[in-house]
A protein has these predicted regions:
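Membrane-interface micro-motifs in multi-pass membrane enzymes
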Residues: 31, 100, 170-177, 255-259
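Membrane-interface segments at or immediately adjacent to transmembrane helices
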Residues: 149-220
């Protein structure tokens, strides 16, 4: 009797909380409608299966509560609202290592599983309704699903949903609008109303850069979770990798925070923003990659380059090997295949391989493929990724600026950045020693998730400062400098044309446009001329069919 009363109280609480979520968290009437529809779809499905009223109310309430909480977790760890197709990533066991990185998440998952268990099995001994009433549950389920499908397909609903970007506060509407065709699983290229004529005319006004037969070896190094730590509030000294002479340097807008590295990989390799793919922006490696017509590796291959990707994860992780192949990478290499230090005895996720060890791996690639030069090597290091729990004490006077939790995380972050800097400088010294033309570029895919706020970054003049990282290029004497102020904000999607210009490599039609946009505005999403911005995107997607192969 006591257990039953406790269960009823438990169910009542979840029902009331779920109703608060549905009726309170809405920016549009359609968000409310979708929340109500989802609740009654879940209720009807469970009632048809079990014929038990209380069990069905309990099930619908808890599942709706869990969806809301998963959305909060997504916002905290990835700074991204939950979409229905995100569950494809969450259910892929290759991505479950996040539970090891963030042990508090494991506890949350256990709690969620417990709640779902209670949602499914509680009140299973209650009296069941007769068959007619259960069939009414099936009929109402069918009607509700049809109504849901119809509403989500209406143009006015899509328009209202798009108005909620980028905040996307309507949890249940976001889920509804990313189910089925709206999710991008039935692939459709982005389109911008064929408004490309303006940009098409402007391209002809841009002076082309010098093209030669220099053909430098190119290394593009993704520094995981990296932003020059001296940009954070405090008195952290700038490490050596961000000092000295550069062939090019800039701050860039990126389209992810704290994770989902593949979004920045997609951007720097294709010259396209993942956000253009809307609800499927987190799945660009799975659903957009096969349709990409142009890419930096493809352009380089046309000019005689052999293209290689070095990744500390197996090729199955986030579909990376297949995606790289779609982008024109000739060969995918895991450090284990080269018997690199820290690579272990089999191909697996190397979350703790150091950046110095990854740099040594690239040196082995140069030796192994000496006869296939010029080489383009795309690599990424992982050691700088969260969680930042290795520091034993707060250092660098950070406790004067942050609470203890953030101070110790930033201490760990900075200590890892010091080691990364040593690896970067060491590798650049190696490239110098080859006595061959080279370009060595390195950049941050996103900032690390340390619980910092916008005002903890010294970017007062920029919106969304947590979505900004740096891009730095060193090179041999024959590589001519592109003069640029570091604080002149650009975008990661424009960086492929930087590498082509530095290498004096002939661009294809896509990267001619990429170069022109960089010269005209130097930004994409932050470009002040919104008419130019739309025309540029239309030129890429509507005129060149860049994502419609």
């Amino acid at each position: 009797m006591i257990i039953r009363r406790a269960s009823i109280i438990f169910t009542t609480i979840f029902f009331l909380v779920t109703m608060i979520f549905i009726f309170n968290y809405k920016d549009t009437i359609f968000a409310l409608i979708f929340g109500i529809l989802q609740f009654f779809i879940l209720f009807s499905a469970m009632f048809f299966i079990t014929g038990q009223w209380l069990r069905s109310i309990n099930f619908a309430s808890i599942v709706m509560f869990v969806l809301f909480m998963i959305n909060r977790l997504s916002l905290y760890y990835y700074r991204k609202a939950l979409f229905a197709n995100d569950f494809l990533l969450y259910l892929d066991y290759e991505n479950w290592d996040i539970l090891i990185d963030f042990k508090e998440l494991l506890l949350v998952v256990i709690i969620i599983l417990f709640l779902l268990g209670f949602a499914i099995f509680a009140y299973s001994k209650n009296e069941k309704a007769n068959l007619k009433l259960r069939m009414s549950g099936l009929i109402s389920l069918i009607i509700l699903v049809l109504v849901h499908t119809k509403i989500e397909s209406l143009d006015i609903v899509k328009s209202e949903w798009l108005k909620t970007f980028p905040e996307l506060k309507n949890t249940y509407m976001n889920i509804s609008m990313t189910i089925g065709n709206n999710s991008g699983l039935d692939y459709k290229s982005p389109t911008f109303n064929n408004s490309y004529e303006m940009f098409k005319n402007k391209i002809n006004t841009v002076t082309n850069y010098e093209i030669s037969n220099l053909k430098p070896n190119i290394v593009l190094w993704l520094n995981e979770s990296t932003l020059d730590a001296s940009f954070y509030r405090g008195n952290l000294e700038q490490v050596d990798m961000f000092k000295g002479d550069f062939k090019f340097q800039t701050l860039n807008r990126v389209h992810t925070f704290g994770g989902k590295t593949w979004k920045s990989e997609f951007e720097v390799l294709t010259g396209l923003s993942p956000d253009e793919f809307g609800a499927s922006s987190s799945l660009v490696f799975q659903y957009a990659a096969p349709h990409i017509k142009y890419s930096l590796p493809k352009n380089l291959k046309e000019e005689g380059y052999y293209t290689i990707a070095l990744n500390p994860y197996p090729g199955s992780a986030y579909n990376s090997k297949n995606a790289y192949k779609n982008f024109g990478i000739d060969e995918y290499i895991h450090p284990n295949e080269l018997k690199c230090d820290g690579a272990g005895d089999k191909i697996r996720k190397l979350k703790y391989i150091t950046s110095m060890q990854m740099g040594e791996c690239v040196k082995k690639i140069f030796k192994k493929y000496e006869n296939k030069q010029p080489l383009f090597i795309y690599m990424l290091t992982i050691n700088e990724h969260a969680p930042y729990n290795r520091a034993k004490e707060v250092k660098f006077g950070l406790n004067e600026f942050y609470d203890e939790s953030q101070s110790i995380k930033l201490t760990d972050y900075y200590e890892r950045q010091i080691e990364l800097s040593k690896a970067v400088i060491n590798f650049n010294d190696f490239m110098l020693s080859t006595n061959k033309p080279y370009i060595f570029a390195y950049f941050g895919d996103h900032q690390g998730n340390m619980g910092l706020k916008n005002n903890d970054v010294k970017f007062n003049n920029f919106t969304n400062p947590l979505n900004i990282t740096g891009f730095y290029v060193k090179g041999s004497n024959g590589v001519k400098e592109i003069k640029n102020n570091l604080m002149n904000l650009s975008e990661l999607s424009l960086m492929p044309s930087v590498l082509l210009e530095l290498g004096q490599i002939k661009p294809n039609d896509f990267f001619k446009a990429n170069y022109a946009m960089r010269k005209i505005c130097n930004k994409v999403d932050d470009c002040e001329d919104k008419e130019l911005l739309e025309s540029y995107k239309s030129y890429l997607y509507d005129y060149l069919n860049a994502a419609n192969k």
